[in-house]
Amino acid sequence: EFKEAFSLFDKDGDGTITTKELGTVMRSLGQNPTEAELQDMINEVDADGNGTIDFPEFLTMMARKMKDTDSEEEIREAFRVFDKDSNGYISAAELRHVMTNLGEKLTDEEVDEMIREADIDGDGQVNYEEF
C-alpha cells in the first residue's frame, strides 16, 4: 500500500521523490505549495540530507503521520479536495476525478465499489461523517 502511494509521487520511477514531484502531486490535489514549503516538507523527513525522499524515509514519514492522527482540520481539508462542488458530498464522479489526477486509473466498478464501502446511509455518495 505504501509502495503504491510512493510510486504515485515518484513520477519518473527512480526511487526518490524530489520537490518537483512532490509539487506535482500536491497541485493535482488542488494545493499550491511554494518552493520553500516543498523544500521544508522534504527536509523534515530527508534523513540522509540528499534533498530527496527515498522509500525508507517515506515510510518514516507515513509512520509519523499515522501516529500523529490526522487533526479534524486535516480531515476536513482532505474532504474538500474530493468535494469539488462543495455540496457536502463526494460523488462517484468527484472521486474518479481526484483519483485520475493522482494517476490512479480506476474502472467505474472500482469507483462504485469505493463509494459503496464508505456509503453508510446508501444514498450513493459519501458525506463528511462517512468520509
From Swiss-Prot:
The keyword Calcium applies. Ca(2+) 3 binds at D83, D85, N87, Y89, E94. It holds the Pfam family EF-hand_7. Ca(2+) 4 binds at D119, D121, D123, Q125, E130. It comes from the Eukaryota. Signal peptide: none annotated. PROSITE patterns: EF_HAND_1, EF_HAND_2. One of its GO terms (molecular function) is calcium ion binding. InterPro entries: CALM/Myosin/TropC-like, EF-hand-dom_pair, EF_Hand_1_Ca_BS, EF_hand_dom. Gene3D superfamilies: EF-hand. One of its GO terms (cellular component) is cytoplasm. Ca(2+) 2 binds at D46, D48, N50, T52, E57. SMART domains: EFh. Ca(2+) 1 binds at D10, D12, D14, T16, E21. Keywords: Calcium, Metal-binding, Repeat. Residues 1-32, 33-68, 70-105, 106-131 form the EF-hand domain. Belongs to the calmodulin family. This is Neo-calmodulin. It comes from Gallus gallus (Chicken).
